[in-house]
């Protein structure tokens, strides 16, 4: 009984917990994933995970309908995004959006040096302006990346 009550209250609590400087937010609906929210609202998957690392777990499987998530924070809200598809490379993304190597990595610090950890469905910030993000939860990103990487082979 207590567990059911706690689960029912969780979305309400998460919507009450305000993230300092949150500039925009979204309400989770049934079937949402971190990547689908990112695509729907034009926010990078990295940024979504970063600003919600206190409420979204490592596999992004604890989203609850009615839960409010922050999409961006003041001065760190990239809204020019691209969704990775099969066979994408960082070089291709850079050329397509006219962004430098430094800017791509600055706006997507989770990408490794070889750019072999981007995954199909990941939403990247492709703005030509560089954003400086606070420290990110590398464990959360890696859990997302390695959860979806096998689909790159399809």
Where are these regions (language model features)?
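Acidic, Ser/Thr-rich intrinsically disordered and amphipathic helical segments
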Residues: 5, 33-36, 47, 62, ...
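Extracellular/cell-surface secretome signature
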Residues: 41, 97, 136-144
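Primarily a LysM-type cell-wall glycan-binding module
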Residues: 17-41, 67, 73-97, 154
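Short, compositionally biased
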Residues: 82-90, 138-151
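Residue-level signal for mature regions of secreted extracellular proteins and peptides
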Residues: 11, 15, 27, 53, ...
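A positional/structural detector of protein chain ends, strongest at the extreme C-terminus
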Residues: 3, 150-154
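Extracellular LysM carbohydrate-binding repeats and other cell-envelope/extracellular binding modules
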Residues: 20, 45-77, 102-138
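Cleavable N-terminal signal peptides of Sec/SRP-targeted secreted and luminal proteins
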Residues: 3-18
């Amino acid at each position: 009984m207590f567990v059911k009550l706690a689960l029912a209250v969780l979305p309400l609590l998460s919507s009450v917990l305000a993230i300092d400087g949150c500039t925009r937010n979204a309400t989770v609906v049934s079937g949402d994933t971190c990547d689908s929210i990112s695509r729907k609202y034009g926010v990078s998957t990295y940024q979504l995970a970063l600003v919600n690392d206190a409420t979204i777990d490592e596999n992004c499987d604890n989203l609850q309908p009615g839960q409010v998530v922050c999409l961006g924070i003041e001065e760190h809200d990239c809204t020019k995004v691209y969704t990775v598809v099969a066979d994408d490379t960082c070089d291709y993304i850079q050329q397509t959006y006219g962004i430098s190597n430094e800017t791509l990595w600055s706006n997507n610090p989770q990408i490794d040096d070889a750019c072999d950890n981007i995954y199909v469905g990941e939403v990247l910030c492709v703005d030509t302006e560089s954003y400086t993000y606070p420290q990110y939860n590398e464990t959360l990103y890696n859990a997302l990346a390695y959860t979806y990487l096998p689909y790159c082979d399809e």
